């Protein structure tokens, strides 16, 4: 009887477990599901925003260890400009936004950027006033020093810290020596 009991459990497990198994998702199906989730999120953010946002860029710091001093001495690191956007938070505290910004780049030339941002959010208190976020932004930008404003796609990481409707967001623009490697930051005010 003692041997029969474990054997019975094994047989029961082998018979019942396939009934609850989900089909595996591979390659194209996984990409299709991901793409549908992103496009649905973009549509919902556009059609049902929680907030209208004002963007105020305030920092474009060039990593000194990746630049010659002569270059950084002449760069603009105060990217005056602004932007507008729509955003929403889901039930888990994740943030989604559509945005457009215009600011002065490192060479003091105007640079537009528009796109979609998403962040996984973590609240630091029960009142949900303090929030940290980590995610990505994707979109289109253009620069004077790159083929006279030919549109350039971008995907950059996003980091944020916020209190109620005021958030500081950062991204890091990777690059090579004397090019890129910029910490870009802006203030986002939600209305």
Swiss-Prot record:
It is found in: Cell outer membrane. Pfam families: PagP (PF07017). It is an enzyme of class 2 (transferase). It catalyses: a lipid A + a 1,2-diacyl-sn-glycero-3-phosphocholine = a hepta-acyl lipid A + a 2-acyl-sn-glycero-3-phosphocholine; a lipid IVA + a 1,2-diacyl-sn-glycero-3-phosphocholine = a lipid IVB + a 2-acyl-sn-glycero-3-phosphocholine; a lipid IIA + a 1,2-diacyl-sn-glycero-3-phosphocholine = a lipid IIB + a 2-acyl-sn-glycero-3-phosphocholine. The keyword Acyltransferase applies. The active site is at residues 62, 105-106. GO terms for molecular function: acyltransferase activity. Residues 1-21 form the signal peptide. Its EC number is 2.3.1.251. Transfers a fatty acid residue from the sn-1 position of a phospholipid to the N-linked hydroxyfatty acid chain on the proximal unit of lipid A or its precursors. This is Lipid A acyltransferase PagP. It comes from Enterobacter cloacae. The lineage of its organism: Bacteria, Pseudomonadati, Pseudomonadota, Gammaproteobacteria, Enterobacterales. The gene is pagP.
